[in-house]
């Protein structure tokens, strides 16, 4: 089973058309990523003590079904790609509406940044298992290094 979190949607998630605003989907996906890090034993505030933090290069959202005001949603996280040194990663989030249908799929491409140097970084070895607890997507791939 993939890592997932159930949320009660809130009034501010919705737009004048009475469905969830597009940015709210991405906010919930981001929340799941951060909660996953804590679940894996590495809260972001602990990682930041080593001057490292997660960043995104891209975030692509595909909307499938509406989510209406008052619905509870489930948001999961799966690993869809990873490079050899685990410095770059891709995650896929599926957001399910209250009737269990996929309402959106969000694909993100991320990495780690050195918070002082403002350059891409590799996580210290003590975080090697951070992403190991995520299920892999069926189309999981290895990200080829651009350094070679």
Predicted regions and their residues:
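C-terminal edge beta-strand
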Residues: 8, 107-108
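Hydrophobic core residues within well-ordered beta-strands of beta-rich domains
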Residues: 3, 55-57, 73-75, 89, ...
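Hot-dog-fold acyl-thioester-processing enzymes
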Residues: 1-58, 114-148
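Generic short beta-strand
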Residues: 11, 92-94, 110
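Residue-level signal for glycine
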Residues: 100-102
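Conserved GNAT-family N-acetyltransferase fold
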Residues: 29, 93, 106
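Hydrophobic beta-sheet segments that form the core/acyl-binding groove
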Residues: 60-98
